[in-house]
């Protein structure tokens, strides 16, 4: 794998546990600042479903040999620069940073066929430039009823758009036609971003 990555080292990336939506926003911001010509090829991807119960494997917070965890939602970053190359940058995975799309999807999501329908995963894919403009969160979802934090927040101020409204729910929602970007099932997501060996060979001729 080439070493010409958007983010040379995972240690150089902004990261706070349990704030994946903000971690990915910071990745988008970093690309805009350091590699602006690549921003149009980058995406923020939310994974969730109606019941907000999505199993993911190979996660740092996971348990057992397979490191599986059930999240209410998760967010990761995609760089799709070429017809034969698509990379996933996930700050919470135990897979390499980055990982080729096919390997990431195969090991992180496996298949919906063996899962109950209520655990099927859906994906909201948002262009990075759109995400930088429209995402807004006052972090209310991380507070208990008494106002204390479920998990310590990032040290920087909340990310608020010009509307100054908390809209995290619009990104987690997996209803097609609502919210920014496009919503895909797992199979549709793979069809849109997987670069098959045949396509790679054709483009390398």
From Swiss-Prot:
What are the recorded GO MF terms, alphabetically? protein-N-terminal asparagine amidohydrolase activity; protein-N-terminal glutamine amidohydrolase activity
> Is this entry keyworded Magnesium?
no
The record, for InterPro entries, names: N_Gln_amidohydro_ab_roll_sf (IPR037132), NTAQ1 (IPR039733), Prot_N_Gln_amidohydro_ab_roll (IPR023128)
Q: Where is the signal peptide?
A: none
- Disulfide bridges in this chain: none
**EC nos:** 3.5.1.122
Q: Which GO terms describe its cellular component?
A: cytosol; nucleus
Q: Where along the chain is the active site annotated?
A: 20, 74, 90
What UniProt keywords are attached to this protein's entry? Hydrolase
Give the Pfam families listed for this entry.
Nt_Gln_amidase (PF09764)
Reaction equations catalysed: N-terminal L-glutaminyl-[protein] + H2O = N-terminal L-glutamyl-[protein] + NH4(+)
Its quaternary organisation is: Monomer.
Q: What does this protein do?
A: Mediates the side-chain deamidation of N-terminal glutamine residues to glutamate, an important step in N-end rule pathway of protein degradation. Conversion of the resulting N-terminal glutamine to glutamate renders the protein susceptible to arginylation, polyubiquitination and degradation as specified by the N-end rule. Does not act on substrates with internal or C-terminal glutamine and does not act on non-glutamine residues in any position.
The record's similarity note reads: Belongs to the NTAQ1 family.
Its protein name is Protein N-terminal glutamine amidohydrolase
